[in-house]
Design a protein with these regions (language model features):
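Nucleic-acid endo/exonuclease domains
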Residues: 1-124, 128-178
Length: 178
């Protein structure tokens, strides 16, 4: 493995932005092509969700596995960190990165709680779920979930049809034909 200089690492990290990332663009393009309309980075909602689908009362966060600690466990009693396959914690300045990722995870949980209290649904899509081998299934699942949310929100829940007593002539006639 090649060792990068501190300057090169700094340049790489500085080039990473929070908006218009490749995973976000994949999700945006897929949703738009399937007819879903959305707003980007809404400043009116906590956490500035990547995509906001007002019609579905749904916020979508497209998270990078490293920055949001996908499947990373921090054992606070010993300070041990269990890296996941898609999120490797750097060995240099490890304490800094563990603290940063843990703060990001806590912030994500708090943001989703606040959005849920406001009546919004939250969907998190991880960068590793958009790899070519999993991409189509992830995007189909996202579209299915959004349609399910819409149907649940717009379900007609009312009283069932009234049941008639046996004396009702139409009911008796219907039973006799059967």
């Amino acid at each position: 493995m090649n060792k990068l200089s501190v300057e090169r690492i700094h340049k790489n990290m500085a080039a990473i932005h929070s908006k218009d990332t490749k995973p976000e663009m994949i999700v945006r393009k897929a949703l738009w092509s399937r007819g879903f309309r959305y707003r980007l980075n809404s400043p009116k909602l906590p956490g500035h969700p990547d995509l906001v689908l007002k019609k579905y009362r749904t916020c979508i966060f497209v998270n990078g596995c490293f920055w949001h600690g996908h499947n990373v466990e921090v054992k606070s009693d010993k300070g041990e960190v269990i890296s996941s396959e898609c999120c490797k914690i750097p060995h240099t300045r490890r304490e800094f990165w563990v603290a940063k990722i843990k703060r990001n995870q806590e912030r994500d949980i708090e943001t989703q709680k606040r959005l849920a209290e406001m009546g919004w649904h939250c969907i998190t899509i991880w960068e590793c779920e958009l790899k070519p081998s999993k991409r189509e299934q992830t995007l189909k699942s996202l579209a299915f979930t959004l349609n399910k949310i819409w149907l649940e929100e717009h379900a007609v829940i009312g009283k069932p049809y009234p049941q008639f007593e046996e004396e009702d002539g139409m009911l008796k006639a219907a039973e006799e034909q059967i």
